[in-house]
């Protein structure tokens, strides 16, 4: 053990001796109380409870003894989660030493720690004195993730949770991290970002969630439900939903299943078109209810065609569509050949080469379809 005066003390030790034991041996030899001793090896201050083996101190190693002026000081370290750690330090401690103390208390490896004081990031080799850090100063600890990032999760109670994540983490992974921190089972968590409910199998990158983004956590009452969505082609989609889901959420689920952008979806229930900001509960949509999905064409419109049997067909059309085009769409839906179709609007039979615009047929107009018997004239 080498002192600052240059004197070297020789000690007989075991690898299993703790730093406390070593300080007691130095007290026996030199009369220096352990609480005034700081031992340094390989640039690191040695912590009392650790053993020589922990620091890989082998035979004939040299430790450096620095006297601790009575009266170290306390400083505080505040993390992004709002937790405050209290540390016992000396002005002569290096930033490395401080990070080692934080590791001992919190288990965070020094290479993942960034310490900030007065807006400056602190460099490892410098001392607290170099930065004029005095007793009861507060440092801020920011985690440096290997290739990772931090995001925030805000709960309905207003509490904000900080999570360490990677862009490649799935929403399932994020829910598991929230469970670790908050104890909320993943199946009760709904995460919302940019107004969209996040689906389990997708990644943060899929939703363009970047560092320091804020997600919103909504608790899912146990017991979601299934509803059905019927498309104009007759296909039925089954969705897992909550009563508290908004119509936007439902459209996002339909997009995930069918690839149809929400802005092209119109949902109808009990004859009413559903508005995006409202919830299923607002419309009294219960388990196993069936919604109807109508596609809203960009720049297009819907018209209705009523048959003599009273059936109404919905068509997606453009004003520039010709009557021929419309008959072809009816054939696609109903299988009726165009040459057997007669279309009537406002009491007039529509001629094939003309357009809907020519007849001032606008969105949600109703045409009447009369069948022309073969061999008629």
Swiss-Prot record:
GO terms for molecular function: mRNA binding. Residues 377 form a propeptide. There is a cross-link at residue 120 (Glycyl lysine isopeptide (Lys-Gly) (interchain with G-Cter in ubiquitin)). It is found in: Cytoplasm; Nucleus. InterPro entries: Ubiquitin-like_dom (IPR000626), Ubiquitin-like_domsf (IPR029071), Ubiquitin_CS (IPR019954), Ubiquitin_dom (IPR019956), Ubiquitin_ubiquitin-like (IPR050158). GO terms for cellular component: cytoplasm; nucleus. Its main location: cytoplasm. Residues 1-72, 73-148, 149-224, 225-300, 301-376 form the Ubiquitin-like domain. PROSITE patterns: UBIQUITIN_1 (PS00299), UBIQUITIN_2 (PS50053). Keywords: Cytoplasm, Isopeptide bond, Nucleus, Repeat, Ubl conjugation. There is a cross-link at residue 148 (Glycyl lysine isopeptide (Gly-Lys) (interchain with K-? in acceptor proteins)). It comes from the Eukaryota. Ubiquitin exists either covalently attached to another protein, or free (unanchored). When covalently bound, it is conjugated to target proteins via an isopeptide bond either as a monomer (monoubiquitin), a polymer linked via different Lys residues of the ubiquitin (polyubiquitin chains) or a linear polymer linked via the initiator Met of the ubiquitin (linear polyubiquitin chains). Ubiquitin is generally synthesized as a polyubiquitin precursor with tandem head to tail repeats. Often, there is one to three additional amino acids after the last repeat, removed in the mature protein. Alternatively, ubiquitin extension protein is synthesized as a single copy of ubiquitin fused to a ribosomal protein (either L40 or S27A) or to an ubiquitin-related protein (either RUB1 or RUB2). Following translation, extension protein is cleaved from ubiquitin. For the sake of clarity sequence features are annotated only for the first chain, and are not repeated for each of the following chains. Belongs to the ubiquitin family. This is Polyubiquitin.
């Amino acid at each position: 053990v080498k002192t600052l005066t240059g004197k070297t003390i020789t000690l007989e030790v075991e690898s299993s001796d703790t730093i406390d034991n070593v300080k007691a041996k130095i007290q026996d030899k030199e009369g220096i109380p352990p609480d005034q001793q700081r031992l340094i090896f390989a640039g690191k201050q040695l912590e009392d409870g650790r053993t020589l083996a922990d620091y890989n101190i082998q035979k004939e190693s040299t430790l450096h003894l620095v006297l601790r002026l009575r009266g170290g000081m306390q400083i505080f370290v505040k993390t992004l989660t709002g937790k405050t750690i209290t540390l016992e330090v000396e002005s002569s401690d290096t930033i490395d030493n401080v990070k080692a103390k934080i590791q001992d208390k919190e288990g965070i490896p020094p290479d993942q720690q960034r310490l900030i004081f007065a807006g400056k990031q602190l460099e490892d080799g410098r001392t607290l004195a170099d930065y004029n850090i005095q007793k009861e100063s507060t440092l801020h600890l920011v985690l440096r993730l290997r290739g990772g990032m931090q995001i925030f999760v805000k709960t309905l109670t207003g509490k904000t949770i900080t999570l360490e994540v990677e862009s490649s983490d799935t929403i399932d992974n994020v829910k598991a991290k929230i469970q670790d921190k908050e104890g909320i089972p993943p199946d009760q968590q709904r995460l919302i970002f940019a107004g969209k409910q996040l689906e389990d199998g997708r990644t943060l990158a899929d939703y363009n969630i970047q560092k320091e983004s804020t997600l919103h956590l909504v608790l899912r009452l146990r017991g979601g439900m299934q509803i059905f969505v019927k498309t104009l082609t007759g296909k039925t989609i089954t969705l897992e939903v909550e009563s508290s889901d908004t119509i936007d959420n439902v459209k996002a689920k339909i997009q995930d299943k069918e690839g149809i952008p929400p802005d092209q979806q119109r949902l109808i229930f009990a004859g009413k078109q559903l508005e995006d900001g409202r919830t299923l509960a607002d419309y009294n949509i219960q388990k196993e209810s069936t919604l109807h999905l109508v596609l809203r064409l960009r720049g297009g419109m819907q018209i209705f065609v009523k048959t003599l049997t009273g059936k109404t067909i919905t068509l997606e059309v453009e004003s520039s569509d010709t009557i021929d085009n419309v008959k072809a769409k009816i054939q696609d839906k109903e299988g009726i050949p165009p040459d057997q179709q007669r279309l009537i609007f406002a009491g007039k039979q529509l001629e094939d080469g003309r357009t809907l615009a020519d007849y001032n047929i606008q969105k949600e107009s109703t045409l009447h379809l009369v069948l022309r018997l073969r061999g008629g004239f």
